[in-house]
Amino acid sequence: MVKRQISMVLDLNKCIGCQTCTSACKLQWTNRNGREYMYWNNVETHPGPGYPRNYEHSGGGFDEEGALKIGITPSAEDYGIPWEYNYEEALMTGTDPWLRPNVKPTWGANWNEDEGRGEYPNSYYFYLPRICNHCANPGCLAACARNAIYKRQEDGIVLVDQERCRGYRYCITACPYKKVYFNEQISKAEKCIFCYPRIEKGLPTACAKQCVGRIRFIGYLDDEAGPVHLLVERYKVAIPLHPEWGTKPSVFYVPPLAPPRIGDDGEPTEETRVPLAYLKELFGEAVVPALETLKTERAKKQSGAESELMDTLIGYRHPEMFKLS
């Protein structure tokens, strides 16, 4: 058992898919030395295959009895082979008239960006940012034969001991979210570290600090004065992704309140544009009361009444969104 668990809440109603969080993480951690294909933070368009491709059907996690399930390791093509461009030939020497990738791209972290489902006027999609969930019951930790993966006692952040890791990749197959990666240059597993050097200095993660939509809240689950406890424990509007996988994520999502469907008469209906059945696939049955609470509190705010929940979700100031002490 860890002493405390640091957690993150992401409000999907505010994410604009700008990829600023992805850029912040990529520039900070994964732009070199065998990490080029890795996106510790990525923003997916849903419904869609995600990153790596079809990770939701790649196995891992735990069954209903708590037994570890071993999945598959995604291929390089499922992640998207990183490429560069022929800048020298196209821009400097003029030996090639076209600027082109040096490999033929077939997939990438945001390959299906802004694609959705449905037909006009009821087509729909939403953005879903993902990092390592720093789970309370990590499949990667349970699978590691070298005891190289551990949770920090002071904050529950899940890390890989690079001295102990031998690159067996069991952690990748056991993580149902496929948020552990293999660095072929050093033959070791690597993953999101929740920017722990920043956390230790009282600073939020790079992805959270750079988020222009202010969708991310960081704090400790047991801090009753913090936004994470309020959203997860008190109002229960922040819920984990795929709770049925049994890893008990420490990253939570406020589900999207989609616009209403438009009926055949051109008028809005009571049905939401994003099907509730699809949201249940992602977040389980807890999404139903979460959405109802959001609707109720939003209506209160619209009527001019006070709403602690809505004021918190607006995120006026960073100090109110990040409680790291």
From Swiss-Prot:
Binding site for [4Fe-4S] cluster 3: 132, 135, 140, 175
Binding site for [4Fe-4S] cluster 1: 15, 18, 21, 211
Domain 4Fe-4S ferredoxin-type: 6-35, 123-154, 156-185
TM spans (from-to): none
Taxonomic superkingdom: Bacteria
UniProt keywords, alphabetically: 3Fe-4S, 4Fe-4S, Electron transport, Iron, Iron-sulfur, Metal-binding, Periplasm, Repeat, Transport
Presence of keyword Repeat: yes
InterPro entries: 4Fe4S_Fe-S-bd, DMSO_Rdtase_II_Fe-S_su
GO molecular function: 3 iron, 4 sulfur cluster binding; 4 iron, 4 sulfur cluster binding; electron transfer activity; metal ion binding
Function statement: Electron transfer subunit of the dehydrogenase during anaerobic growth on dimethyl sulfide.
Quaternary organization: Heterotrimer of alpha, beta and gamma subunits.
Protein name: Dimethylsulfide dehydrogenase subunit beta
Species of provenance: Rhodovulum sulfidophilum
Gene assigned in the entry: ddhB
